Amino acid sequence: MERYSNSTREVAQDGRRGALMLSVSIKHPDSESFIDAKMTEGKVTGANVSVKLDDDFMKAVVNKTTYKQQYPVDSANPTTVKEIDAATLWQKIIHNAWKSAEPGVLFWDTIIRESVPDSYADLGFQTISTNPCGEIPLCPYDSCRLLALNLYSYVVKPFTKEAYFDYELFVKHVRLAQRIMDDIIDLELEKIDAIMEKVKSDPESEEVKGS
């Protein structure tokens, strides 16, 4: 985690530093250590940390029952299995979030149910994490395409009795914004191809490239 965090801190563009989300499933046997990652001051300062909570874990918290962790997380034949007290780990998440503002929580089963890419899982799309601030669930090699509209700018004659919201202009700009965001996806695909080609042509070992 420190390696990824430090690498991200070294990345900057136009004066803006890099951003990174590190997330792990609560089902992973090492998730408790992950949850404690930022309790030491000065550690993992270049990344946000979030834990993926599934429905079974939250039910175990409510019912005060045990919860099974395993590795690999999604394997039918895991090599490691561990029973934990769900409520105790939940309390640790709450305490750490209060103490250090992290970890964040991702209600993962809900995200997958509502995620558009996972509707096309048969075509290879799979949501694996989110952008650094958690707004957008993302697939591998995906990026967060964010666009903001200042709603105040559509208020005509603000702070007067004649004030009103210019819905016509707002709708026009929303359509243009959606068009821009869709075009960005096409440009992004070209950049991904260029990045992958650069990685393949680099002289580093396959172990380094894979990390």
Residue positions per predicted region:
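Active-site cavity-forming subdomains of large catalytic enzyme subunits
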Residues: 1-173, 180-211
